[in-house]
Amino acid sequence: MKLLATPEIWFVCGSQHLYGPGPLKQVAANAQKVAAGLAASKKIPLKIVFKALLTTPDEITNLCIEANSDANCAGLILWMHTFSPAKMWIRGLSTLKKPFCHLHTQFNRDLPWGDIDMDFMNLNQAAHGDREAGFLHTRLRLNRKVVVGHWSDAEVQERIGAWVRAARAWHDWQGAKFARFGDNMRFVAVTEGDKVAAELRFGFSTNGYGVGDLVAKVASEGINDRHVDELCAEYEKRYAVAKELRRGGKRHDSLRYGARIELGLRTFLEEGSFKGFTTTFEDLHGLRQLPGLAVQRLMADGYGFGAEGDWKTAALLRAMKVMGEGLDGGTSFMEDYTYHMNPKGHQVLGAHMLEICSTIAATKPSLEIHPLGIGGKEDPVRLVFDAPAGPALNASLIDMGNRFRLLVNEVTAVKTPKLPKLPVARAVWECQPDFKTACAAWIYAGGAHHTGYSYSVTTEMLEDFANIAGIELAVINADTKLGEFKQTLRNNEVYYHLAQGIRV
């Protein structure tokens, strides 16, 4: 994946000097073993580093300051092996800017009932040491994830792994840049938003560039025939290229121009260190084709993308791709396009004009050329494929004016029916809990028609991500009841309006 860092997660253990040097030495040794056990887990995608045993307010504060200033630290895992009086943590945690996960565990899994004495009891106090810590975290109104269970438990490691993926995506957003070619599709509301508020809240910036900047890269002498030849040869190796597009075919020139768009767009993004971008078909002056194939391939390399100027979805898609890195399944830009409203089974056909990522292809994509019927340009080249059946989700990041909301709908993708006259990439899914409830809830929540669609990212990861970001999360799943969902939205309206004023 392009521009993807591999930061660390710091494992931090809390105690106090009350117990003396012997027990503290044992606490440190045990904490290192716990950290090593987590580091060895294949369910956790980043390196877990035992950082410190903290026993004084100054030690705690200094470590939090160090974490803030270390660009390679994506977050902390905190555990209180013994009782660690929480007032010692006030100053440090009040300064901490990195996300943290509170692991409520203990070193030993089973109690040695016949051998327990007071030395054992004093050493293994996480049961109440973590409660003391939890009170302070709650008193300080700190967003965090609490994971409960023995550190060797696969389910515990999986939950930590979900948080680590969210923390990595948050780390990736800090200082990230997204390029907007042109503006919004005209008169569209949901793709608008406050980019200043977004940078304050999320840490990434979005800035506009004239499509002429892209046109100049596409036409650049730095992209010569050899580069185009090599990329076209790669297309023929990776995809089932239509005969008319192959070398010697009557429309091979269209494929070569599509390759030029990819080379120019890739050069622009790499030179500017961008992690994502948007386009709009209403602002393509100087380009012969709508960028289709280029966008699909850049998404497959990890770039975020949003159509029609949708910068929030571009940023969200990048975050979701980071979260899902290394997992089975893929993640793509998506749009709810049209419905199958048969009473025997309601389904959604998801697609876009061209820009669906090939990481969600069920089989080898075909590379084709067809008229688009919108945009007024030459016929664009594009990858055509069906998405696979299986559990998936749609996620949408929207600007509510006074806050941001992350909306998630869990879905079940089904086998795509034959679509011989629809030459675009597509997915078909059934909504949870059902079509009518899910669509009504989505509309009540103000969800966009653009989403990040993923087979690899889970609701838990997105919940952790929203928690780190300090934004509202609304989930539509198999348990959703519309009346309760609407009331939750009303409650959230009040909570997020007041929350900043009651933090202390």
From Swiss-Prot:
Per UniProt, Mn(2+) binds at E308, E335, H352, H450
What this protein catalyses is: beta-L-arabinopyranose = L-ribulose
As recorded in Swiss-Prot or TrEMBL, the protein's gene is named: araA
Question: What Pfam family is a match, any one?
Answer: AraA_central
Organism superkingdom: Bacteria
Q: What is this protein called?
A: L-arabinose isomerase
The cofactor note from the UniProt entry for this protein is:
Binds 1 Mn(2+) ion per subunit.
Q: Which family does it belong to?
A: Belongs to the arabinose isomerase family.
EC class (word): isomerase
UniProt-listed Enzyme Commission number(s): 5.3.1.4
Needed cofactors: Mn(2+)
Could you tell me the Gene Ontology terms of the biological process aspect for this record? L-arabinose catabolic process to xylulose 5-phosphate
- One MF annotation (Gene Ontology) recorded for this entry: manganese ion binding
Pathway given for this chain reads: Carbohydrate degradation; L-arabinose degradation via L-ribulose; D-xylulose 5-phosphate from L-arabinose (bacterial route): step 1/3
- What job does this protein perform? Catalyzes the conversion of L-arabinose to L-ribulose.
Q: Which UniProt keywords apply?
A: Arabinose catabolism, Carbohydrate metabolism, Isomerase, Manganese, Metal-binding
Gene Ontology, cellular component aspect: cytosol
